[in-house]
Regions:
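Basic, flexible linker segments flanking DNA-binding modules
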Residues: 1-88, 188-189, 244-251
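C-terminal domain-tail junction helix/linker
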Residues: 6, 175-179, 201-260
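RNase H-like polynucleotidyl transferase catalytic core
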Residues: 65-70, 156-161, 175-194, 211-214
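An active-site-proximal beta-strand-loop segment
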Residues: 88-118, 124-126
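Active-site beta-loop-alpha junctions of metal-dependent nucleic acid enzymes
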Residues: 102, 120-148
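Acidic/histidine-rich, metal-coordinating catalytic segments
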Residues: 147-166, 241-244
């Protein structure tokens, strides 16, 4: 027979449940591992991962994994591995449906090593200029003294074969900046998987869960989300540090000034 929980355990679980529900309000598709990581490493709450799982399961808050049919493709090549910041960046775009405006396009640049979103742009179009705006933001963030003087090793930019990253102007800009482009193929979609995973997180957290009716409202929301993602979301792949913490840790470990 299952032993009844003590009053202190019941109170503790109730407190944790309220905190879990608060997180799930903003991030309804977060699983128990990510919620546990956020509670422990960002809010400083000492709690066992199994306890979070048990509470969420009892309250039907566990995210159900959908079974998806996968297209058959040719042999997969291993995806690139970023050994340090500014080694591999990824760039990708997604679109947001606005009730009375049509489509809004979000372009994002991600540093694969730190998982940090270092550049982004929003536009009612989907033009090469928008991709260049996101890329130039990333360059200015990471190379404030100029990319030619600050870049120590070759920087690669991974993208799909869309008309924007393959346009003559975009490719010429990358060449002038000293950035080498890598293009994914249909048979090797994992080549830009880190960037696509972040785009999926954006969709889960802020696009699919809300009905957006004005570009300004979404702009405010995405700017806040990116700031929270970079500075407040711990990543298991980063030893439960945030992207900003991980980047600053790398700089301090290698005796490089922390950018502010």
């Amino acid at each position: 027979m299952k032993r009844a929980q003590s009053l202190s355990v019941v109170k503790r679980n109730q407190m944790l449940l309220e905190q879990i529900k608060e997180i799930k309000t903003d991030h309804p598709l977060w699983g128990y591992r990510r919620i546990w990581s956020y509670l422990k490493y960002r809010q400083g709450i000492a709690v066992n991962k199994k306890r979070i799982y048990r509470i969420m399961k009892e309250q039907n808050l566990i995210v159900t994994q959908l079974v998806r049919l996968k297209a058959r493709r040719g042999p997969m090549h291993p995806k690139p591995h970023a050994d340090h910041p500014n080694h591999f960046w990824g760039i990708d775009m997604t679109k947001i449906k606005l009730a009375s405006w049509g489509w809004l396009y979000l372009t994002v640049v991600l540093d694969w090593h730190t998982k940090e979103i270092i550049g982004h742009s929003l536009s009612l179009r989907s033009k090469t200029d928008d991709w260049l705006d996101a890329l130039h933001m990333a360059v200015n963030n990471r190379f404030p003294n100029g990319i030619q003087s600050d870049m120590k090793e070759q920087l690669f930019l991974i993208s799909d074969n869309g008309c924007q990253p393959t346009s003559q102007r975009f490719m010429m800009n990358c060449s002038l900046l000293g950035i080498k482009q890598i293009f994914t193929t249909w048979s090797n979609p994992k080549c830009n998987s880190d960037t696509e995973r972040v785009m999926r997180t954006i969709k889960e957290d802020i696009i699919w869960c809300y009905d957006w009716d004005h570009p300004f409202n979404f702009e405010v929301a995405i700017n806040k989300w990116i700031n929270d993602y970079n500075n407040d979301f711990p990543h298991q792949a980063l030893n439960n540090m945030t992207p900003t913490q991980f980047y600053e840790h790398f700089l301090s470990k290698n005796n490089q000034p922390v950018l502010t």
